[in-house]
A protein has these predicted regions:
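A short acidic-to-branched-hydrophobic micro-motif
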Residues: 229-242, 269-278
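One-carbon transfer enzymes
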Residues: 1-221, 225, 255-291
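A conserved acidic, glycine/proline-rich C-terminal tail/linker
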Residues: 239-261
Length: 291
């Protein structure tokens, strides 16, 4: 079976590094210009690489120019959506998505799953169509979200699942045994792209949501943050505190700074047990208010 791979980022690189020794060398790899490890991988393994946005006929023209034909396209953490012209030119295209579709369509689904307090996520192999993560499901694997998991630790779990799921898809595609199940759109949810500025903590949230918000975006992600006198405080870990306070105390108030800062929220308080910019802790004083 002739295979082409669309992939981006660290997760994509780790997966293709794992599978290259177990499948025939792909006919081509498509990636983005920032995925330097994947570009280097293509060069080292003498695989033709398309670099950039595939839309507007660019990848179609690349395949035609290089007389590349494939039986199956595998998309792994690929940065771009495919347009109709490209999809129509492919015999079969399967994407691996980091959620249990139809829930959490869209970007960084594992991060959103933690933020929303889910106890499980997963990886779904689905047919690529012209919409975002809406194609028929061919395989699905559940992944538990433990209470101390972060966005990074969930990706570590995905790294182990993706290769085996890909091998299974390839084997069943070769034998024409892939079973397609339509997604139930009535159960679908969608979450968009996140930026570093989206990490602002709202101290009016309950402590459970604040903890989930922080761990979902912990290092090496840009991080959840708050503002102390306009200066950004990036928080990588919080734990619940049983410190007492008055009901009239404003949410976001620093209650104590003896060991770690303890911050008031509506249903209790949280202790900032890991802050990325440690020097800023010297500026914390009791009764100051984080924004």
């Amino acid at each position: 079976m002739l295979i082409g791979i669309l992939t981006s980022g660290g997760l994509g690189y780790k997966v293709i590094s794992e599978i290259i020794n177990r499948i025939k060398k792909p006919e081509f790899i498509a990636t983005d210009s920032n995925s330097e490890q994947i570009i280097e991988f293509s060069n080292q393994n003498e695989v033709l690489a398309f670099i950039g946005n595939p839309r507007g006929g660019k990848l179609v023209d690349f395949l035609k120019k290089n007389e590349i034909e494939v039986d199956l396209i595998l998309s792994i953490n690929y940065l771009f959506l495919l347009d109709e012209e490209l999809i129509d030119s492919l015999p079969m295209a399967i994407n691996l998505h980091g959620s249990l579709l139809p829930k959490y369509r869209g970007r960084t689904p594992h991060v959103w799953s933690i933020i929303n307090g889910e106890t499980k996520t997963g990886v779904t192999a689905h047919v690529i169509d012209t919409n975002c993560d809406t194609g028929d499901v061919v395989k699905q694997v559940e992944v538990p979200i433990e209470k101390d998991d972060t966005g990074a630790t969930i990706l570590k779990k995905f790294e182990k699942i993706y290769p085996e799921l890909l091998f299974s898809v390839i084997e069943e595609a070769q034998s024409d045994d892939l079973k397609r199940v339509k997604q139930d759109n009535s159960k679908a949810t969608f979450f968009g792209k996140r930026t570093p500025d989206d990490g602002l903590i709202n101290w009016s949230w309950h402590k459970e949501r604040i903890r989930n918000w922080v761990r979902a975006q912990a290092n090496p992600y840009p991080g959840a943050f708050s503002l102390l006198n306009g200066e950004r405080v990036i928080v990588d870990e919080v734990n619940y505190s049983d410190i007492g306070f008055s009901d009239t105390t404003k949410n976001g108030t620093i209650l104590d700074v003896i060991e770690n800062p303890i911050i008031k929220c509506p249903n209790g308080a949280v202790e900032l047990t890991r802050v990325r910019n440690q020097d800023i802790l010297k500026k914390f004083k009791s009764k100051m208010v984080l924004k």
